Amino acid sequence: MIVEYEKDGRVAVITLNRPEARNAVSGELAQALEEAVDRFENDDDLWVGVLAGNGPVFCAGADLKAVASGNANLGTSRGGFGGFVTLERTKPIIAAVEGPAVAGGCELVLAC
């Protein structure tokens, strides 16, 4: 899965899972992240979310290979960049940053 979703008690752990691409945001990751946040928001048993990255980098920002190939759709209409930045939420999400959060990766952190 490009975005992993786990429940741990009252906490949802949402993990960016593209370590081979430094968790760079592609259109597929953006859609999956928006869906994971929606799942968290709709579960009344969950109180807080944690956004993490798999591997040595939290998130390298935009997937530049996708952009170079002409696929610059790195967000969603509702969630903005990464399917997350402008997504309205009613519950807190904490960024668990281990490793670099570069460019758009930093934007994801700031949106938490």
Language model feature labels by segment:
Residues M1-P56:
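Conserved CoA-thioester-binding segment of acyl-CoA-metabolizing enzymes
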Residues A32-E34, D38-N42, V48, L64-V102:
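An acidic, glycine-rich surface segment that forms the CoA-thioester-binding/catalytic face
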Residues G55-V57, G99-P100:
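Short glycine-rich anion-binding loops that position phosphate/pyrophosphate groups of nucleotides
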Residues P56-L64:
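Amphipathic alpha-helical interaction surfaces in cytosolic regulatory modules
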Residues G105-C106:
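Short glycine/serine-rich donor-binding loops of glycosyltransferases
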